[in-house]
Amino acid sequence: MTTTELVALLHLASPALPIGAFSYSQGFEAALDANLIRDADTARDWIASGLTDVLAHGELPFLAHQLARWHAHDADALARENAWFVASRESAELRRETEQMGWSLAQLCASLEWGDAARRATLAALKPIALPTAFAYAAAAHDAGADATLAAYAFGWVENQTSAALKAVPLGQLAGQRIIVALRGAIDAAVKRALATPPDAVNTFAPQLGILSARHETQYSRLFRS
């Protein structure tokens, strides 16, 4: 990996990326309300479970395959698989989340003129666009490899979940850093599992997350949009 590719992925994984990630908890807040999360240890366990049991089987392998589609510029496969991912979201909140963040990232890519004109036209035609599809586009535009792209995406997800824990539990900054450090190995394992997953084995089945997300839609007091 070149320094330019590394910096591009650090940019994409940054919480400063203006796509609204900070406003979503992906069910974390609902799990807290259900008393599944109570402290730093249970927050770490919840985030670890989401990474190894959900992302590693669904979002990360999907991202890897979309990255390959962008490198090959297979517009038909991109559209078909993007539509499948959007349809796989199990609640209105989770669907709005991936659509809003995907749209914001796609707009950013277009405004910064990342990628060639033909691929930018394909990107613009994907409506709605899921976040992993847009993230894969941005990574492909910088010639990033699959392993580093997935690691950046997974780290950004862990960091955002940890940020939600700091605000909602609440936890201190040191407790949050301990969670991130504790999950470094899990990120590596999740990436390896995702890279070994063929397209027909991508699995987004996560009933507990779907139920909690649906409950969050009518939760009395909320900090986050999901």
Swiss-Prot record:
GO cellular component, one term: cytoplasm
Annotated function: Required for maturation of urease via the functional incorporation of the urease nickel metallocenter.
Gene Ontology terms for molecular function: nickel cation binding
Protein known as: Urease accessory protein UreF
Main location per the UniProt record: cytoplasm
Family listed: Belongs to the UreF family.
Localization annotation: Cytoplasm
Pfam families: UreF
Keywords tagged on the record: Chaperone, Cytoplasm, Nickel insertion
Subunit: UreD, UreF and UreG form a complex that acts as a GTP-hydrolysis-dependent molecular chaperone, activating the urease apoprotein by helping to assemble the nickel containing metallocenter of UreC. The UreE protein probably delivers the nickel.
